[in-house]
UniProtKB/Swiss-Prot annotation:
PANTHER family: GLUCOSYL/GLUCURONOSYL TRANSFERASES, UDP-GLYCOSYLTRANSFERASE 76E5. Its EC number is 2.4.1.-. Signal peptide: none annotated. Keywords: Glycosyltransferase, Transferase. This is UDP-glycosyltransferase 76E5. Gene3D superfamilies: Glycogen Phosphorylase B (3.40.50.2000). GO terms for molecular function: UDP-glycosyltransferase activity. UDP-alpha-D-glucose binds at residues 272, 324-326, 341-349, 363-366. Belongs to the UDP-glycosyltransferase family. It comes from Arabidopsis thaliana.
Length: 447
C-alpha cells in the first residue's frame, strides 16, 4: 500500500531547557521548509505561548512526571535520570494518539540525546528514531570516552599531572583534564548518563548542531566510532528564523546600543540557568566600569538582588536588562565583544557574527567550549579563578582596545565567513541537511 500523499510528519522531543529547545525548534523549521510537517512534544512548563512564530507546527503536551522547577533542586544529572525513568508511559500514549489522529504518517521521532526514553516508544511503535545533540561534536566525543571509564579509577588517575595533560588519542589538543566532568555532581552518576547518551539503541542517525569547518577532527572521530550516519547541520540559527524564548526579551537595549560607538560595547550574558554570587557581580561591575568601555549586561530574573553600588556604576556607563534578543545584539555594529558562559548556542551565535569572547564557563561542557574558543579557534580570552575587578578590566581591554583583540576579531571574521559558506548551497552543512532529508524520506518509505 502506498504511503499517504500528505506531508510526512516529524515528531520533535526537546529537553525542557532554553539551550536545548531553541536549536530543536530551529531544526524543526529547517525540516518544515524541506516539506515535513512538524509536531513538537513539550511538557506543561514549556507550552509555547508564541505559536505565531511557528505557523503550521503542531504542539502536543506530555503530562509532566517531574516539574521543571525541580531542575535546580535536583541538579542536572538527577533531573535527567528521573525525567527518563518516569516519562516513557505518558510519551508512548501521546505518540499512539498522534498515530490514530494522523493516520500513521509519522516519518521519524527526533529526540534530544537527554530524552533517551523516547527511543523505546519509537521502537515499540515501529517508528524510525534519530538523536539530536544540541552541544558540540567534541562534547559528544567526550561523552563517548567518559562512558567507557570507571569512575573510581578515573578519579585516582586524574591526581597524576602527567595523566591530566595526556592528549586524548586522535583528538589533539583535547587532554584528559579537559573532559567535561566538573559541575555535574557525583562522577559515577554522571558517567551513567554519558553511557545512556552514547547508547544509540535502535536510533538510525545522529544530528549535531555544528559545522565541519569548526570541528572536523571530532566529526571524523564520531563518523568512525559510531555505526550510524552523523549529520552536522549547523549553525542552525543562520538557516532559520525560529525564535523561541522561555523568557521575555527586553528590546529596549537595542535603542541603547544605537547610541554607542562602533565595536565599543562589551555584551555580558551568562545564559539562562547560571547563577552568580553578589561579590562576583560587584567585582565584575567595577572591572567593567574601570575599563572605560560601555557595557550591556543581562542579569536574569532571580539574580537581581544587587548592591546599590552596582546600580550606581551601571547608570554611568552601562545598561542592564533581564533578557536580551541575543542574535540582534551580537549582529549590532556597536558590539565589540561578548562575555559568555560559553554554552554551545552562544558560542555559535558569537562566532557567526565575528564577535570575540571573554569566556567565563561554569560547568564541564562550557569549560570545554571555552578551551576551544581560546586555544583552538583563538577568538577569545579565558577568565579562570575568582573574578577580580583588575582581571575583568584587563580582559575587556585585551578584547576591545589592544592589538590582541584585533587579531581575535580577524580570526572570528574568517570563521564567520566559513560558517556562512557552510549553510549556503553546496556548503557542507547545506549538503548534510539534504542528505538527512533523503535519509528520512527513505526511512519513511521503508516503514
Amino acid at each position: 500500500m502506498e504511503k499517504n500523499a500528505e506531508k510526512k510528519r516529524i515528531v520533535l522531543v526537546p529537553f525542557p531547557l532554553q539551550g536545548h529547545i531553541t536549536p530543536m525548534m530551529q531544526l524543526g523549521q529547517a525540516l518544515n521548509l524541506k516539506g515535513f510537517s512538524i509536531t513538537v512534544a513539550l511538557g506543561d512548563s514549556n507550552r509555547v505561548s508564541s505559536t505565531q512564530h511557528f505557523p503550521g507546527f503542531q504542539f502536543v503536551t506530555i503530562p509532566e512526571t517531574i516539574p521543571l522547577s525541580q531542575h535546580e533542586a535536583l541538579g542536572v544529572v538527577e533531573f535527567v535520570v528521573t525525567l527518563n525513568k518516569t516519562s516513557e508511559t505518558s510519551f508512548k500514549d501521546c505518540i499512539a494518539h498522534l498515530l490514530l489522529q494522523h493516520g500513521n504518517d509519522i516519518a521519524c521521532i527526533i529526540y534530544d540525546e537527554l530524552m533517551y526514553f523516547s527511543e523505546a516508544t519509537a521502537k515499540d511503535l515501529r517508528i524510525p528514531s534519530v538523536i539530536f545533540t544540541t552541544g558540540s561534536a567534541t562534547n559528544h566525543v567526550c561523552s563517548c570516552i567518559l562512558s567507557k571509564l570507571n569512575a573510581e579509577k578515573f578519579l585516582i588517575d586524574m591526581k597524576d599531572p602527567e595523566v591530566q595533560n595526556m592528549v586524548v588519542e586522535n583528538l589533539h589538543p583535547l587532554k584528559y583534564k579537559d573532559l567535561p566532568t566538573s559541575g555535574m555532581g557525583p562522577l559515577e552518576r554522571f558517567l551513567e548518563i554519558c553511557a545512556e547518551v552514547v547508547n544509540k539503541r535502535t536510533a538510525s542517525a545522529v544530528i549535531i548542531n555544528t559545522s565541519s569547518c569548526l570541528e572536523s577532527s571530532s566529526l571524523s572521530w564520531l563518523k568512525q566510532e559510531l555505526s550510524i550516519p552523523v549529520y552536522p547541520l549547523g549553525p542552525l540559527h543562520i538557516t532559520t528564523s525560529a525564535n523561541f524564548s522561555l523568557l521575555e526579551e527586553d528590546r529596549s537595549c537595542i535603542e541603547w546600543l544605537n547610541k554607542q560607538k562602533l565595536r565599543s560595547v562589551i555584551y555580558i550574558s551568562v545564559g539562562s540557568i547560571a547563577h552568580m554570587e553578589t561579590k562576583e557581580v560587584l567585582e565584575m561591575a567595577w572591572g567593567l566600569y574601570n575599563s572605560n568601555q560601555p557595557f550591556l549586561w543581562v542579569i536574569r530574573p532571580g539574580t537581581e538582588s544587587m548592591p546599590v553600588e552596582v546600580s550606581k556604576i551601571v547608570s554611568e556607563r552601562g545598561c542592564i536588562v533581564k533578557w536580551a534578543p541575543q542574535n540582534e545584539v551580537l549582529v549590532h555594529p556597536a558590539v565589540g565583544g561578548f562575555w559568555s558562559h560559553c554554552g554551545w548556542n552562544s558560542t555559535l551565535e558569537s562566532i557567526v557574527e565575528g564577535v570575540p569572547m571573554i569566556c567565563r564557563p561554569f560547568n564541564g561542557e562550557q569549560k570545554l567550549n571555552a578551551m576551544y574558543i581560546e586555544s583552538v579557534w583563538r577568538v577569545g580570552v579565558l577568565l579562570q579563578g575568582e573574578v577580580e575587578r583588575g582581571c575583568v578590566e584587563r580582559a575587556v581591554k585585551r578584547l576591545i582596545v589592544d592589538d590582541e583583540g584585533v587579531g581575535m576579531r580577524e580570526r572570528a571574521l574568517v570563521l564567520k565567513e566559513k560558517l556562512n559558506a557552510s549553510v549556503r548551497s553546496g556548503g557542507s552543512s547545506y549538503n548534510a541537511l539534504d542528505e538527512l532529508v533523503h535519509y528520512l524520506e527513505a526511512e519513511y518509505r521503508n516503514t
